[in-house]
Amino acid sequence: TDLAASAPARPIVVLGMHRSGTSAIAKTLLGLGAWMGSEQFVTRRTEHALVQDCNQRLLNGHGGHWSAAPELVDGWVSDPASSDVVADARVALRDLAGHGPAAWKDPRNAFTLPFWRSLLGGDPVAIIVYRHPLEVAASLAKRNDFGIGHSVALWEQYNRALLVSAAGLSVTSVAYSALALDPIRTLTAVRESLTEFGVDLPGTASDAASDVESDRRHHVFDTLPDEIVTPQQRALWGALCGLAPHDEHFTTPDLPEVHPASRELLAERRAAIAARRDADERATELRSRRALLRRLVGKSGRDA
C-alpha cells in the first residue's frame, strides 16, 4: 500500500512505563544510529512530537489520560476516536521512513502500539524496559507528587498493557537496574538481539553507553512489601523479571486479574480528569461569550 511504502521498515518501538528507563534506551538507540525523526520533531526526551501527540489524542479520545489510561475495548483501533488520528499518524510515519533503521519512544506506546501496528507495512521490533514498581513510584512522587497507590496501580496498568501489545513481535527485554549498573554489557546484548531480528545499527555499545550516565538510578528498592503491593502486582513483577532477554516471537505471560481496588483507583482518577476537562471547557466557553458580549456592547456604543 501507499502507507506501507511511506512507513519505516521494521522500526524499533520502545515499550515501558514512565520513569522506567525508556528515555535512557531512546538516547542509546540514537547513539547507536537509529533514526528518531527530523530535528523539528524530536523532543529533549528523544520522543517524536507527532507520535507523542497522536498517542495523547488516542488516550484522551477514549476517555483516558497518561496518568490513568482508558480501558480499551475490542475494535478500538478502528473506531471513530482512533480514525480521527490516522492522518497525523501517517505524517509521523512518513517522517520516520527513509533514513535507515527507525525507532520511537513514548510510554503510551504500551496502549497504542496496536494502532501503530495497524498502519505499518510489517511488524516492528520491540524493546521492553522494566523497573521495580517502588522505584517508579518514588520517581513519580518526586516529579508529579503522585501517591504510592496511584503510582503502583499505574505501573501495573502500563506493564500489563505492553505485555499484551507486544504479542507476536520480536522482543528484547531490559531491566533498568541492569542498564544502570552495566550499560555497555546491557546495550551490547540489545544491539546483538536487534541484529538477529534484522535491524542492524551502525553504532557501538560503548559509544551509546555514555548516554546512560545522566539517567543514573536515584531510587533503589529490592523488596515488595505486602502492605503496598497487591498479589497481582507482585505476580506482574515476577513475570517481568522472568522475561527472556531475546525472544523471536513474544508470548504474553499469563497473569491474574487486576485487583478491584487498583481498577477502582484508576477509574476514580479518570473521572476526576474528565470533570476537570469539562470545567475547563465550560470556562473557555464562558470567556468566549464574555468576549463576544464586550464586542457587541462596544459596537452598540459606537453605533449610538
Predicted regions and their residues:
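Positions that flank functional sites
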Residues: 43-45, 181, 209
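Active-site micro-motifs of SAM-dependent methyltransferase domains
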Residues: 31, 36, 135, 181, ...
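PAPS-dependent sulfotransferase catalytic core
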Residues: 1-86, 288
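Conserved alpha-helical elements of sugar-nucleotide-dependent glycosyltransferases
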Residues: 20-24, 112, 278
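Residues that form generic nucleotide/phosphate-binding pockets
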Residues: 57, 61, 75, 88, ...
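A polyampholytic, Gly/Pro-enriched intrinsically disordered region
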Residues: 61-65, 147-154, 224-230
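PAPS-dependent sulfotransferase catalytic domain
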Residues: 90-202
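PAPS-dependent sulfotransferases, especially Golgi type II membrane carbohydrate sulfotransferases
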Residues: 1-8, 84, 163, 192-304
